[in-house]
Amino acid sequence: MGLPVVAIVGRPNVGKSTIFNRLIGERVAIVEDMPGVTRDRLYGKGEWLTHTFHVIDTGGIEFGETDEILTQMRYQAELAIDEADVIIMIADSRTGVTDADVELSRMLNRTGKPVVLAVNKADNPEMRADIYDFYSLGLGEPFPVSGSHGLGLGDMLEEVCQHFPAEDDEEKRDDVIRVSIIGRPNVGKSSLTNAILGEERVIVSEVAGTTRDAIDTPFERDDQSYVLVDTAGMRKRGKVYETTEKYSVMRAMRSIEDSDVVLVVINGEEGIIEQDKKIAGYAHEAGRGVIIIVNKWDAIEKDDKTMQRFTELIREEFKYLDYAPILYVSAKSKQRVHTILPKVNEVAQAHSMRIPTAVLNDLVTDATIRTPPPSDRGKRLKINYATQATVKPPTFILFVNDPELMHFSYERYIENKIREAFVFEGTPVRIWTRKKT
């Protein structure tokens, strides 16, 4: 089932994006400054007390050229119906209840999903007290908030979290590998999903999200349990969704966040385009295990150098995914589909690998002897010791005399030495420097 999804809807200019940015906090920042690794201000992850959830700013999606407010709101409501466990409707305390608010509240009431009404721009006590008219919308208690000042959001989130579906015990099992299949439209995600599941003799069940359309599909193969994340996301949508690039990116981002290993699917017939790089960049930035799948490989004319040339192209276009294995398959003919799950197992194992501290420090010491650390104005970097902080992805901390002396190239050198000594295929390796205390 993955993390709960909260959709923010409302008519234009009520402050949806301001509240969205408040909820996701610093996660909107771009982690790495390299091509293909960007973050749209459309979708993010929020936290409140012990709860973590996805947030969708439906106002960030433009469906067509129409300026008709009601049409735009209807699209927002449809998106919320498809995606959300809980819907936050934003209204404006300064304008009061409008006809558009009334119409939107009726749409949302028909979804049958929990709706929390937030009355924004209630920036002072008088405005916070004067919201009783909003009870007329029939959405229960209105919560006065100020997105610009951060006021009232705690009470609103407390109500939102009350409606989250209970977490399935199956979701918590460490031995289950969660896999998502992502890519732009028409690369063959649905066919690949069916090809993978079609090879399985034991499909345990289809577990539907309690209040949303997304379906995770558990299955087993050779005594290993898997969950294919959000297979409902592969279904054909209406034209408005199929033609909306941002929608497919948002869908991919949510699947990535809920996964251990991500299969990035490329259409071998069409080659690589900018949207491929954007979607793959999200998988890298999220720190998930990554396998690049070139689909429809049976449909192109080949010579003995074709695969080599395509591999070189992938390595050039996806420089930040140089650790990701590449598989050439055909979902339609099932060619090499049998190689996918064994590779998923290898990547998942690497993604959760721990290196003993003593072994890690021996490796780092040897690396610094072979290539001494850099110096700046007579002061040389000294790595005192190293430790592995976390897994998924493997993250290492180097305690040093002065973090400012650590150059990116030397950090990459240490990463390469770690990769040479241990099999970290398919997983990013994070290295952080801290000042030794």
From Swiss-Prot:
Record-listed GTP 1 binding positions: 10-17, 57-61, 120-123
Keywords: GTP-binding, Nucleotide-binding, Repeat, Ribosome biogenesis
Cell membrane among keywords: no
MF terms in GO: GTP binding; ribosome binding
UniProt domain KH-like: residue ranges: 353-437
InterPro entries in the record: G_ENGA (IPR031166), GTP-bd (IPR006073), GTPase_Der (IPR016484), KH_dom-like (IPR032859), KH_dom-like_a/b (IPR015946), P-loop_NTPase (IPR027417), Small_GTP-bd (IPR005225)
One Pfam family recorded for the sequence: MMR_HSR1
Domain EngA-type G: 4-168, 177-352
One GO term (biological process): ribosome biogenesis
List of residues binding GTP 2: 183-190, 230-234, 295-298
Transferase in keyword set: no
HAMAP family linked: GTPase_Der
Family assignment from sequence similarity: Belongs to the TRAFAC class TrmE-Era-EngA-EngB-Septin-like GTPase superfamily. EngA (Der) GTPase family.
Oligomer and partners: Associates with the 50S ribosomal subunit.
Function: GTPase that plays an essential role in the late steps of ribosome biogenesis.
Protein name (Swiss-Prot/TrEMBL): GTPase Der
Native organism: Brevibacillus brevis (strain 47 / JCM 6285 / NBRC 100599)
Lineage: Bacteria, Bacillati, Bacillota, Bacilli, Bacillales
